[in-house]
């Protein structure tokens, strides 16, 4: 048995440990700390009795209060859903113009539309709606089918070139490889690129103007500004959906690529489509 050691200065027993002649006094813990520790033990026992706490083989103790975190969550969800019912009903009953003019409804619709956008639209258009190659940027003011509320709603509801919806936007640029010879294709590509950039060959671009007037102006307009009613893009704004440069234009003229957007009305319902419309319009590019 080790010999007890009493500190000669304080008269307090030491722990028996020594480091380079330094000994640790074995003072008792403060009484307030001890009673606090005992209180936490009592509180823990009371909690284990009152609430679900002790895991069993297939379940856990229920607790005397019958509390359930799942039931509490469901109650909170039901309360939140009930508080939103009135606003959802108003959105369902009003037009997108009426919703947009009501600040409270507009704010609620934007929040709902932002949530629906992340789940259904961000895969193609990006989480920030900035798009990518082949997928339009929804933040700018370049709209193939129009950027006002009615046009955006129609596009979301019925999609673009979507076979399952008879009201879908349906326009396709024909393949001009069967109409134009390779030289004419290079000429019109140089002309279109030259509308916003420096063409590789000014002579080709000059000759391409007449090729454009004869073959492209019917859809894109004499000024190449496009026509929303036909889904024909503006070629004079330096915004390119698929790729940039004369080579990319040559490929698109010869064998066009056409994107498809699903019709969302049948999947999401009219109310969510309206919320998406308000949200997309609020991004800054809506007209």
From Swiss-Prot:
Heme c 2 binds at residues 173, 216, 219-220. Heme c 1 binds at residues 121, 124-125, 261. One of its GO terms (molecular function) is oxidoreductase activity. Residues 58-287 are periplasmic. The chain crosses the membrane at residues 37-57. Signal peptide: none annotated. It is a single-pass membrane protein. Residues 1-36 are cytoplasmic. GO terms for cellular component: plasma membrane. InterPro entries: CcoP_N (IPR032858), CcoP_N_sf (IPR038414), Cyt_c-like_dom (IPR009056), Cyt_c-like_dom_sf (IPR036909), Cyt_C_IC (IPR008168), Cyt_c_oxidase_cbb3_su3 (IPR004678), Cytochrome_c_Oxidase_Subunit (IPR050597). Binds 2 heme C groups per subunit. Keywords: Cell inner membrane, Cell membrane, Electron transport, Heme, Hydrogen ion transport, Ion transport, Iron, Membrane, Metal-binding, Oxidoreductase, Plasmid, Repeat, Respiratory chain, Transmembrane, Transmembrane helix, Transport. Its cofactor is heme c. Its main location: membrane. It is found in: Cell inner membrane. Residues 108-196, 203-284 form the Cytochrome c domain. GO terms for biological process: oxidative phosphorylation; proton transmembrane transport. Pathway: Energy metabolism; oxidative phosphorylation. Belongs to the CcoP / FixP family. C-type cytochrome. Part of the cbb3-type cytochrome c oxidase complex. FixP subunit is required for transferring electrons from donor cytochrome c via its heme groups to FixO subunit. From there, electrons are shuttled to the catalytic binuclear center of FixN subunit where oxygen reduction takes place. The complex also functions as a proton pump. Component of the cbb3-type cytochrome c oxidase at least composed of FixN, FixO, FixQ and FixP. This is Cbb3-type cytochrome c oxidase subunit FixPc. It comes from Rhizobium leguminosarum bv. viciae.
């Amino acid at each position: 048995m080790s010999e007890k050691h009493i500190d000669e200065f304080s008269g307090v027993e030491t722990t028996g440990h020594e480091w380079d002649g330094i000994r640790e006094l074995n003072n008792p813990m403060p009484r307030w700390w001890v009673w606090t520790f005992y209180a936490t033990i009592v509180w823990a026992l009371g909690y284990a009795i009152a609430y679900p706490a002790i895991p069993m083989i297939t379940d856990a103790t229920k607790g005397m209060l019958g509390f359930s975190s799942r039931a509490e969550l469901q109650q909170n969800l039901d309360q939140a859903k009930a508080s939103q019912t009135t606003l959802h009903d108003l959105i369902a009953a009003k037009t997108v113009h009426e919703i947009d003019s009501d600040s409270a409804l507009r704010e609620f619709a934007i929040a709902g539309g932002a949530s629906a956008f992340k789940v259904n639209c961000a895969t193609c258009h990006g989480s920030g709606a900035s798009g990518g190659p082949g997928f339009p940027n929804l933040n700018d003011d370049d709209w193939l089918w129009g950027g006002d509320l009615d046009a955006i709603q129609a596009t979301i509801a019925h999609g673009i070139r979507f076979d399952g919806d008879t009201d879908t936007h349906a326009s396709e640029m024909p393949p001009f490889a069967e109409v134009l010879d390779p030289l004419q294709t290079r000429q019109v590509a140089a002309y279109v690129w030259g509308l916003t950039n420096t063409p590789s060959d000014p002579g080709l671009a000059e000759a391409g103007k007449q090729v454009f007037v004869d073959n492209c102006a019917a859809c894109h307009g004499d000024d190449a500004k496009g026509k929303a009613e036909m889904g024909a893009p503006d070629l004079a704004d330096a915004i390119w959906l698929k790729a940039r440069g004369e080579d990319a234009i040559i490929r698109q003229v010869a064998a066009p690529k056409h994107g498809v957007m699903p019709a969302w009305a049948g999947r999401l319902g009219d109310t969510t489509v309206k919320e998406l419309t308000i949200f997309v319009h609020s991004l800054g590019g809506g007209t």
